[in-house]
């Protein structure tokens, strides 16, 4: 590995919009998140097996391939 060409990695605190703070190594000085594992519904168990389909794509797929899926 060549010396002196790689950016310096430093330990930073990443702040989420929910107020949670996480530490990680990065080449940037500060980093902000919109969603993290503390506030995302999937990691909190609120999403479960729900499928969020606001445009009917899942139902359209099921209707299109219903004969194939039944066999």
UniProtKB/Swiss-Prot annotation:
GO BP terms: translation
GO cellular component: ribonucleoprotein complex; ribosome
Pfam family, one: Ribosomal_L31
Keyword Metal-binding: yes
UniProt keyword annotations, A-Z: Metal-binding, Ribonucleoprotein, Ribosomal protein, RNA-binding, rRNA-binding, Zinc
Record keyword Signal present: no
Binding site for Zn(2+): 16, 18, 36, 39
Molecular function in Gene Ontology: metal ion binding; rRNA binding; structural constituent of ribosome
Requisite cofactors: Zn(2+)
Domain of life of the native organism: Bacteria
Cofactor: binding details: Binds 1 zinc ion per subunit.
Family as reported in the entry's similarity comment: Belongs to the bacterial ribosomal protein bL31 family. Type A subfamily.
PANTHER family per UniProt: 50S RIBOSOMAL PROTEIN L31, CHLOROPLASTIC (PTHR33280), LARGE RIBOSOMAL SUBUNIT PROTEIN BL31C (PTHR33280:SF1)
Function: Binds the 23S rRNA.
Record's subunit section: Part of the 50S ribosomal subunit.
Protein name (database record): Large ribosomal subunit protein bL31
């Amino acid at each position: 590995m060549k010396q002196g060409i790689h950016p310096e990695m430093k330990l930073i605190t990443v702040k989420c919009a929910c107020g949670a703070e996480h530490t990680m190594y990065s080449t940037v000085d500060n980093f902000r998140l919109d969603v993290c594992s503390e506030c995302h519904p999937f990691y909190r168990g609120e999403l479960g097996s729900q499928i969020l389909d606001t445009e009917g794509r899942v139902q359209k797929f099921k209707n299109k391939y219903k004969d194939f899926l039944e066999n």
